[in-house]
Amino acid sequence: MSMANFTAGRNSCTFQEEFKQVLLPLVYSVVFLLGLPLNAVVIGQIWLARKALTRTTIYMLNLATADLLYVCSLPLLIYNYTQKDYWPFGDFTCKFVRFQFYTNLHGSILFLTCISVQRYMGICHPLASWHKKKGKKLTWLVCAAVWFIVIAQCLPTFVFASTGTQRNRTVCYDLSPPDRSASYFPYGITLTITGFLLPFAAILACYCSMARILCQKDELIGLAVHKKKDKAVRMIIIVVIVFSISFFPFHLTKTIYLIVRSSPTLPCPTLQAFAIAYKCTRPFASMNSVLDPILFYFTQRKFRESTRYLLDKMSSKWRHDHCITYGS
């Protein structure tokens, strides 16, 4: 039986969390089995075409790197939850795994924001030259700034996340130990605002402007925009899907959970209901590590063509070998 103790003010609650033993290992296993090869392929494809890097593919490379680093930590979490929250890997590893999760989460959000701004400039300001003058050099500097901001935002995870003891078993707390919930609250809310709400607002502003241009009559749109229309629409759809599945539900339930667990007078059933809602959305926040490579596939024509060529070649070889086997 998986149980968690929670203390808030005068309340001392014990949560029943058997669902984590099934849901979390299942989702994390899917993310690991799909995310590891998909992101490795994206990085490999970009590396092979490194002489023809564009600003978008540079952002995609950094996005795939963040995803790949995160999915490599998932076997530890899969083991943890299949063993009823038992964490045998030590306090530093606990902190580092939680740090990887939030670094990937907010890094993905910021790199998707950069990609959206890049696409916005191409659609709404196709003749502007200021963002093209330094080209790839400026893009690499932006990526370095994103990594710096994300690491700085997530470093307090090493302070708050830690191991603890529940029912004589070592566990790894995600946000903070229950007795530090009040001190974690300001940081958790600040991280949500700076790491999710502000980038999300920027993405919405870009997409609203892009939608206005894309919905204009054909004769009012330049030829350069015509060529980018389908690509932009695909990107908008996929980014909206990523936010709908991975980012928005997680941050909504996390914010509510932070508020209720800092309230000393709420009854235990209410605390448990919000804890379950938050912990059910947490594994789906990892799904962006699978969805991000799909974004790359549908927005990069050369990658689609090379992938189809590889699949056709493999299929032809299989049919050839199959015919030889039966022919003999």
Curated annotation (Swiss-Prot):
Single GO cellular component term: plasma membrane
GO molecular function, one term: G protein-coupled UTP receptor activity
Residues with glycosylation annotation: 5
Topology class, membrane: Multi-pass membrane protein
UniProt keyword annotations, A-Z: Cell membrane, Disulfide bond, G-protein coupled receptor, Glycoprotein, Membrane, Receptor, Transducer, Transmembrane, Transmembrane helix
Extracellular side: 1-22, 79-96, 161-189, 253-275
Membrane-crossing residue ranges in chain numbering: 23-43, 58-78, 97-117, 140-160, 190-210, 232-252, 276-298
Cytoplasmic topology ranges: 44-57, 118-139, 211-231, 299-323
Keyword field contains Nuclease: no
Disulfide bond sites: 94-172
Compartments (UniProt record): Cell membrane
Pfam families, per the entry: 7tm_1 (PF00001)
InterPro entries found in the cross-reference section: GPCR_Rhodpsn, GPCR_Rhodpsn_7TM, P2Y3_rcpt
GO biological process, one term: phospholipase C-activating G protein-coupled receptor signaling pathway
Family per similarity comment: Belongs to the G-protein coupled receptor 1 family.
Purpose of the protein: Receptor for extracellular UDP > ADP = UTP. The activity of this receptor is mediated by G proteins which activate a phosphatidylinositol-calcium second messenger system.
Protein name per the record: P2Y purinoceptor 3
Protein species of origin: Meleagris gallopavo
Primary gene name: P2RY3
